[in-house]
């Protein structure tokens, strides 16, 4: 699991779900409490790649509370057989800068694909 370091005194942390090249699909973004099976209030967040709405989500404040929490992104994509592969990314931002990214490449030739991306948030940027 990738660890992403953030500043407790910086701006609000956000998580974005990206797919390149554009594909049909949806996702669920979960923010897990540190060392428990409980989700943070307000999580999960849902979205899909079929509209122009943003797929960026602001995490709750204060930032210090995010230390040790886990972000899990569950993605389902439909890939027509003639379409080339795609890359799905979970991008973590703070103060307008990318502070971390976890990504997976999807193999060619699959019609439907599910994947999970995990990131642990740690203070100390």
Model-derived segments and spans:
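Beta-strand-rich recognition domains
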Residues: 1-43, 49-70, 76-125
């Amino acid at each position: 699991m990738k660890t992403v370091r953030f500043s407790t005194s910086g701006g609000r942390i956000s998580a974005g779900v990206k797919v390149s090249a554009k594909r049909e699909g949806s996702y669920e973004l979960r923010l897990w409490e540190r060392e428990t099976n409980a989700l943070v209030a307000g999580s999960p967040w849902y979205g899909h790649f079929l509209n122009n709405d943003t797929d960026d989500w602001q995490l709750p404040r204060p930032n210090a509370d995010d230390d040790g929490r886990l972000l899990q992104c569950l993605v389902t994509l439909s890939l027509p057989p003639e379409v080339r592969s795609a890359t799905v990314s979970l991008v973590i931002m703070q103060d307008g800068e990318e502070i971390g990214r976890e990504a997976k490449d999807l193999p060619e030739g699959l019609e439907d694909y599910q994947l999970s991306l995990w990131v642990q948030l740690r203070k100390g940027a």
